[in-house]
């Protein structure tokens, strides 16, 4: 799935994107509020300024992802791999 397809499906009301592969995708400013991204591959994805409020990111691969200024209020990050992920206040290392 590419970024355009993801945005079109989300705009049409789809919220279930579990196991989606968006490795290295550019998702700046994307609105994915409430999306199910369980076990999604978001490794090295650019998620700057993304709206991920209430999203299910459990077990997601976010290694090396750029989450600078992303909105994560209420997001489920349980068991997500955030090693090397960039945040607006620093990078996560182990």
PLM regions and their residue ranges:
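Tandem repeat scaffolds
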Residues: 1-94
């Amino acid at each position: 799935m590419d970024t355009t397809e993801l945005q079109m499906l989300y705009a049409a009301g789809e919220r279930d994107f579990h196991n989606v592969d968006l490795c290295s995708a550019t998702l700046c400013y994307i609105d994915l509020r409430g999306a199910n991204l369980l076990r999604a591959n978001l490794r090295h994805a650019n998620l700057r300024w993304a709206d991920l409020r209430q999203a299910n990111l459990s077990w997601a691969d976010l290694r090396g992802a750029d989450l600078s200024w992303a909105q994560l209020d209420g997001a489920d990050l349980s068991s997500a791999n955030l090693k090397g992920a960039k945040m607006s206040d620093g990078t996560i290392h182990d």
